[in-house]
Amino acid sequence: MRFPTPLIEGRLVRRYKRFLADVTLADGTMVTAHCANPGAMLGLNAEGFRVLLSPSTNPSRKLGYSWELVEAELPGGLQWVGINTARPNALVAEAFRENKLTPLIGYETLRPEVAYGKASRVDFLTSGGGLAPCHVEVKNCHLMRQAGLAEFPDCKAARSARHMEELAGVVTAGGRAMLIVVIQMRAGAFDVARDIDPVFDRALRMALEVGVEAYAYTCAVGPEGVAIDTPVPILTPGATLQPARTSG
């Protein structure tokens, strides 16, 4: 996914009220950008970090910029990280259209935001191709506390735990369901940050036990764009250690 307009570079001053970030642009101008990220953003929101913003083309929008990327000093080195949690669903849809997601090859249709379970909406429902429909839940990941190991979540994630329970219900009823973790940075493996949210950890393990599938993909991240790139193993007990290969 290429950014439609060139990103604008700045330096982070502060991130506050979860969804706001003050940034100093290269010319010294201070702007407030929308931060589409409800998480703690551990290790990603230090003052002085180099950031990239996307300018809005909507003249009626209150904030003229959205925070897209941060160049963070993570364990293992400096790298660009995508922090916009609105991007992963679009990245999955793009990879689906390009037949890059091996577990979903053969399906013809990817419908977003389909109601299911008790009171949830699944990110995607795949259908067609003579295959059983598959409920797909997408999670964004940008936490790294050990070199090469991506983790989720970076804060309590009660809603995500409920999603795992709903996916488990789909499989228990005879359907197919999967979790796709989109890691908006380079990493060699994925695991649950169980010390941060043991409830989500238990919910995912229970889902895996009944047959919910789980896959994790890193992304190629840079000023020009973000794209799903490489599958990596999931270290959570009950998940397969063999990553699902991208195709194409």
Curated annotation (Swiss-Prot):
CDD domains (alphabetical): SfsA-like_bacterial
One annotated GO molecular function: DNA binding
Matches recorded under Pfam families: SfsA, SfsA_N
InterPro entries: SfsA (IPR005224), SfsA_C (IPR040452), SfsA_N (IPR041465)
Disulfide bonds: none
Coiled coil (residue ranges): none
Similarity-based family: Belongs to the SfsA family.
NCBIfam families: sfsA (TIGR00230)
Name the UniProt record assigns to this protein: Sugar fermentation stimulation protein homolog
Organism: Methylorubrum extorquens (strain PA1) (Methylobacterium extorquens)
